[in-house]
Structure formats: structure tokens, C-alpha cells
Amino acid sequence: MDVVEVAGSWWAQEREDIIMKYEKGHRAGLPEDKGPKPFRSYNNNVDHLGIVHETELPPLTAREAKQIRREISRKSKWVDMLGDWEKYKSSRKLIDRAYKGMPMNIRGPMWSVLLNIEEMKLKNPGRYQIMKEKGKRSSEHIQRIDRDISGTLRKHMFFRDRYGTKQRELLHILLAYEEYNPEVGYCRDLSHIAALFLLYLPEEDAFWALVQLLASERHSLQGFHSPNGGTVQGLQDQQEHVVATSQPKTMGHQDKKDLCGQCSPLGCLIRILIDGISLGLTLRLWDVYLVEGEQALMPITRIAFKVQQKRLTKTSRCGPWARFCNRFVDTWARDEDTVLKHLRASMKKLTRKQGDLPPPAKPEQGSSASRPVPASRGGKTLCKGDRQAPPGPPARFPRPIWSASPPRAPRSSTPCPGGAVREDTYPVGTQGVPSPALAQGGPQGSWRFLQWNSMPRLPTDLDVEGPWFRHYDFRQSCWVRAISQEDQLAPCWQAEHPAERVRSAFAAPSTDSDQGTPFRARDEQQCAPTSGPCLCGLHLESSQFPPGF
């Protein structure tokens, strides 16, 4: 037998041993895998959430007793909503009650309805069992799954027993999902999410809840776990805009210390929602997230920055986000109703300002292709040959963009000094209407603006190694051409034609006065050796040009 066959047989035997431990049941593993000894009597050691405590719990306080009575009174209202779901599924009353709190004995049926689990089971009869058996035979991550299960919700009475019933169900769900969605496969967060579903749902229902949570457009969690997902980048860009608007000092300090390129709190938001805070607050945040969708993530980020503003402005470059994650957990160490109250207020404020969701994702987001390097904060870059998106509703937060020239149609011919003929052009479909866009027909790479009387002056800080372009590799992909003789004569021609307020391009292609090489050819020669995105032939709209030009 060669090395490959030996390794394959060893791996198959290891997989069978792990599965056998779960099939045998409680305390079937090695001594080091047993973990804490289970409590057989849970009378006075378990709280209302199922968390097992080492010591006997004190009597209920007046506040806790009031909360229990309030939850019982709300149960009938939630039952009425479930009975008439078509009426309440898109109502404001459902959202209001979700922020106030979902009764524990209603949480399972409500999660099932919110994630449309019954419909998924009807469309895929018997598929879960098939995926589970395939996962047992061919899982490549079973060792990681087993290791993560051993540390998932171990203080809860359902998951306290090593290789117990709930841990076995959790193993089956994760193995089945690894086969069901090979793009995501398995990652550590999935064990915590599936465990939360298993607290209130049967095994198969919890599996389809996990499928819907990652696949549905409303929640879009697959972007956090898929290597090709675009959710993270869209939320990251939106977070930078929202925080820069609401907390300019905090974002300014991050820019000054060059902290923006490091880990973002959005990267740990999902972990914070499933681990690190009290189980009661975790469940209430998940209730809101399942009702509201991904737009609930941005208010959570905004609250975190607002609470931690003073600490963040004093944070140095040495491990800022590592300490931020720990302080973010401390932020929620307060009354649950207070946290949800602030979350609701933040949600309303961002919704009013249309900042609860990022702008629509671009086609390149969600693909493995490399993204162009931004020229500045909030600016997006297009490479040569890219086209702008067709006209549609404006983005919620329009940002300056580099764009290609729109198609042109000739308007008239005007004699120019030297016998040349100049054609005044307008964008196609806008004949007779002055446009601030660039007229086509001139040399590729020259920046011309129809509303300007003279050539624009390049800003003094427009340096590929200066603060305007923060990325050092930008100089490999951007080539700024010197102003040609034709551009220098343009103001003289405008002085001779005062009636013509619109800048336009010569019909004949310009050439370099020294070498006689067309600028298009020179652009191709300059861009050929580079590997980054090419910006030759692109222009910036005058209304989007940065201040200081």
C-alpha cells in the first residue's frame, strides 16, 4: 500500500471512531473528553434559560418575577399572531413585539414560521437523512466538528453531557450541512448557530433553519462564511460610511492611526451574537435579527461605536480591535430591556437616514475576482473597459466614482486655429442639452470638463505616494499624463470663441509633440507591464470631483 492509501484508510477509521462515540451516547469518549460531570438533579441549579449553575440559585427577585408575569401575559398575543400569520407577518406590530421580547415557549414555532421551515421540508422530503448519511461517510471536517461541539453551550443542560443526545443531533446537522452546501462546508460559527436552533427546534427543523438562515436573501449570512460571499464587503463599506457620519472623531482617529486596514468589528459581530454574552440577551438579539433581517447588524455596530467612542479614540495601533472585541462584550453586560431599547432607537434613526442597509451589491461582489484599489475613502474604481450600471434608482449613499465616458453624438463642426476642425459633441440621447460629462474623440487619458473654462489644475496632494492614495501599489496601475500642447492651447481657443461655453475634443487624435506617438498607443505601452487595474481612458465627473481641484 502506498502513502495515499494508508492515509485514506487511517482517516476513514478516525471518522468511524468519532461517529461511534456519538452513537454509543453519553460518556462514551476518553477521560479527557468527558468534560465537567453532569448534574443529575437540576431542581435548584438551573435558571429559566436552562443554564446549569454550580451553586444553588437564590430566590427570584421582584424584577425577575415581574418579567416572568409579563412573559406569560404576552404569550396569548403571540399565539394570536401565529394563528393569523398572513396578517401579521409584515406588520409593524410583529417588529414592536419582537423588540419587547418573545416568550420562550413561542420561540420555536415563531422561528419555524420566520424561516419558512415547513415549506422547505415539503419541497425536500427525505433529503436531510440522505445528506446526513453522506456526511457520515465522507466528511472532511469531522475532527473540527467534534472539537467545536465539545465547547458549544456546555453550560446548558441540553449540551452538558459529552456525546449526549443534543450533541449527537448537532453532529448530524453539521455533517449534513457540509454535504448540502459544499461552498460553505463547515466553519466554527455554524456549531453555535445550530446549537441555538436545537434549543427550541427538532433535529431536522434545526437543519433547515440553518439552511434558510444562510441562503435566504433576507438574512444573507452565507456572505460571512462563503469565500465568495459579498455580504462582508458590503456591510464593511456601509459601516465606514455610517461611523464616519455619526462618529467623525472616532473614524478620524482610526484614519490617523491607520487602523482601518485592520480587523473590523463586523468580522466579530456574528461571533458576538452567538457567543460571549448572556444567553438571554443572545436569544433576544437573534429574535430581532430573524424578524428584521440583515439590517439589524448595522444598528448593533453603531451602538458599539457610540458606547465605545472614548475608548476607541484613545486606542493605539497596538492590537486595537482585539481589545475592542472584549470591550464590545462588556457593552452588553447590562439590562436586556435597556439594550433592546437602544437598539430600537438606533434602528429607527438609521432607517430614517436610509443607512440601515448597504447600497446594492455590484456584480463583482460575490465573486472571487480581486476588487480594484480605491483612490480615496468612499471612492470606487473602474478599470478600462468597464461600463457603468444602467440608469436606475440612486444608491442610498452615492459616492464619487470613476466612470467611463458615455457614448457621444456629433453636434456641429467649428473651424479651429491651424485649419483643424472641432466637433462639438454631446452624450447620446441628450442632444442640445449641455452636459458636464467629457466629450469623446479627444486623446485617451486627458481629463476635460465641458463646464470649465480652462484646463483643471491637478491637486498638489494628488501623489501616488502621498496621503491621497493610501495604497503604495496604486502607482503600478495609474499613469497620469502630462498636459499636452493641445491642452495648453485650449484656453486660447475658448477666448476666441466666447459664445461656446462647452469644452469639446478635436476630431483628429492628438499625438505627442516629441515622439509623434498617439496617446492611445502610449497608454497601452505604459499599462502593458502592470498587473493592477488600468485607469487610462477614464475620467471623473465634474460634480463628483474631490474638493481642492
Curated annotation (Swiss-Prot):
A Pfam family reported for this protein in Swiss-Prot or TrEMBL: RabGAP-TBC
Domain annotation Rab-GAP TBC: ranges: 101-293
Places the protein is found: Cell membrane
Region forming the signal peptide: none
Main localization (coarse): membrane
Lipid attachment site numbers (S-palmitoyl cysteine): C318, C325
Gene Ontology terms for molecular function: GTPase activator activity
Function: Acts as a GTPase activating protein for RAB5. Does not act on RAB4 or RAB11.
Protein name stated in the entry: TBC1 domain family member 3G
